[in-house]
Amino acid sequence: MTNPTSDGQPRGRLRVLVLGSTGSIGTQALQVIAANPDRFEVVGLAAGGANLDTLLRQRAETGVTNVAVADEHAARRAGDIPFCGPEAATRLVEETEADVVLNALVGALGLRPTLAALESGARLALANKESLIAGGPLVLAAAAPGQIVPVDSEHSALAQCLRGGTGDEVAKLVLTASGGPFRGWTAEELEHVTPEQAGAHPTWSMGPMNTLNSASLVNKGLELIETHLLFGIPYDRIEVVVHPQSIVHSMVTFVDGSTLAQASPPDMRLPISLALGWPHRVPGAAACCDFSTASSWEFEPLDNEVFPAVELARHAGQAGGCMTAIYNAANEEAAAAFLAGRVSFGAIVETIADVLHAADQWAPKFSETPANVDDVLDAQRWARQQAQRAVAQARPATVSAKTPGVV
């Protein structure tokens, strides 16, 4: 590991392993690393294989030889890929010396690489929230204090604000949500949403699944769970508010009545750079707020009746055990069905609710703490099967000319 100098700054370059290098977070992380060659160096890349040309370009630009591709067919086409197959990213982590592992893989398949990174002793810059949500107790048990640093802008903001007080001084944590592209819509209007509409986020540029999760507010539900797991604050002291401008990324309210907020224009390079260099800031990582021009910041309550995903996540988190893994797996199945045009937008959250209800009624074992990864995977398999049944019975997708934004 890199040691700090006498003034607290890091000595030497941090070796960074980038998992999910061809996605939105991964490509921006490589931009941050390339802009700061005195601070960081890339020692390995991992990707699924869908964007093979991008991965090969990244390999050429960084000069790394340690590359992992999950898609074996894509790996054969590329040639000279040392790690391939479903466990490629995990093996890459296990066999590559790194100071920082950035896990920007998509979905719960990031769980084993997350555990491998923690086992290696590297700092885990975690963008793959699903691995923490699916394997929460296992991940927390494997992590040393301070070993996990969040990449999500909201949790990065909380980590920064929490520097302003001690743990027993925290009254509540406040997560902000843009409200997504359908803020102010009714439940009836949401029934006619198309995948194209759900893929247009008003303030952030993200991958397709994260963008859809933001539109359904499932992403904020996942972030609620992640907040509890990362910072240990009870669910009843974590609040979600809508902030359409996405300038204030989260806030911490302390027992004396003061509130600290972290504000910056929407740019993921800021939380990425902070996670890579933690606890040190990287100069010039992103633009700052311009207070010389007139602007207004709005905050409003979340409509939990129209967007119940956050309260469903709260229920899953309070139930404990593998229930958060079930929440995530049910969403992945329902979201895939929506993107394929098989179900309506509203059916995504309805499917999650149905699967959680089934788990409450018929599978109480899932509320128990998992003993190992296999327990988590069993819960996810059960949830996916339940979700597939629910999807098969769900309302098909329809488009109405009355829907806002539909022509």
Swiss-Prot record:
Any Gene Ontology biological process: isopentenyl diphosphate biosynthetic process, methylerythritol 4-phosphate pathway involved in terpenoid biosynthetic process
EC number: 1.1.1.267
UniProt binding sites for NADPH: 22-25, 48, 51, 128, 130, 207
Protein keywords: Isoprene biosynthesis, Manganese, Metal-binding, NADP, Oxidoreductase
Disulfide bonds: none
Residues noted as binding 1-deoxy-D-xylulose 5-phosphate in the record, renumbered to the chain: 129, 153-154, 178, 201, 214, 219-220, 223
Entry cofactors: Mg(2+); Mn(2+)
Binding site for Mn(2+): 152, 154, 223
Main enzyme class: oxidoreductase
Substrates-to-products reaction catalysed: 2-C-methyl-D-erythritol 4-phosphate + NADP(+) = 1-deoxy-D-xylulose 5-phosphate + NADPH + H(+)
Pfam families, per database record: DXP_redisom_C, DXP_reductoisom, DXPR_C
Molecular function via GO: 1-deoxy-D-xylulose-5-phosphate reductoisomerase activity; manganese ion binding; NADPH binding
Pathway entry: Isoprenoid biosynthesis; isopentenyl diphosphate biosynthesis via DXP pathway; isopentenyl diphosphate from 1-deoxy-D-xylulose 5-phosphate: step 1/6
UniProt-listed NCBIfam families: Dxr
Function: Catalyzes the NADPH-dependent rearrangement and reduction of 1-deoxy-D-xylulose-5-phosphate (DXP) to 2-C-methyl-D-erythritol 4-phosphate (MEP).
Family stated for the protein in its record: Belongs to the DXR family.
Record-given protein name: 1-deoxy-D-xylulose 5-phosphate reductoisomerase
Protein species of origin: Mycobacterium avium (strain 104)
